[in-house]
């Protein structure tokens, strides 16, 4: 039977921020994990479900930027700066070294390895 994924339930496990807050986190935190996506994107839905399933294995907050939030005036420049041409976007900043992935097919192990 087809199991419907519930995007809103999955992203509830993340802390929602706007792009300016995400930029601040990437600049100032030793470890920052940012997920960028939207509910209407099937690839985002798949990635958010996978990422939410890892929250108990990740010892840091996952921040969520809704790419469909039209009140976020700086999201286009944020996406351009970090070369997030498609969603889902996944940004990990460790000691201000930034890695960006725009690939919903990342495995759980690949996601965890990015955080090590």
Residues covered by each model-derived region:
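N-terminal leader/targeting and pre-domain segments
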Residues: 1-32
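Thiol-based oxidoreductase modules, predominantly thioredoxin-like and allied folds used
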Residues: 36, 59-75
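Short, well-structured hydrophobic secondary-structure segments
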Residues: 33-34, 43
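Typically the conserved alpha-helix immediately C-terminal to a functionally engaged Cys/Sec
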Residues: 45-58
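The canonical Cys-X-X-Cys-His
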Residues: 41-44, 90
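Short pre-active-site segment immediately N-terminal to redox-active cysteine/selenocysteine motifs
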Residues: 37-40, 86
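Short Fe-S-cluster ligation motifs
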Residues: 70-87
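Non-catalytic, surface beta->alpha helical segment in thiol-disulfide oxidoreductase systems
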Residues: 86, 91-116
């Amino acid at each position: 039977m087809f199991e419907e994924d519930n995007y809103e339930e999955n992203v509830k496990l993340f802390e929602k921020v706007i792009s300016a807050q995400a930029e601040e986190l990437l600049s100032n935190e030793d470890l920052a994990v940012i997920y960028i996506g939207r509910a209407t994107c099937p690839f985002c839905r798949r990635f958010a479900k996978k990422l939410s399933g890892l929250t108990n294995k990740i010892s840091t907050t996952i921040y969520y930027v809704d790419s469909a939030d039209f009140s976020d005036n700086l999201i286009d420049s944020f996406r351009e700066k970090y070369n997030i041409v498609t969603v889902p976007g996944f940004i990990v900043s460790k000691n201000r070294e930034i890695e960006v992935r725009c690939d919903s097919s990342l495995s759980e192990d690949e996601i965890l390895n990015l955080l090590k």
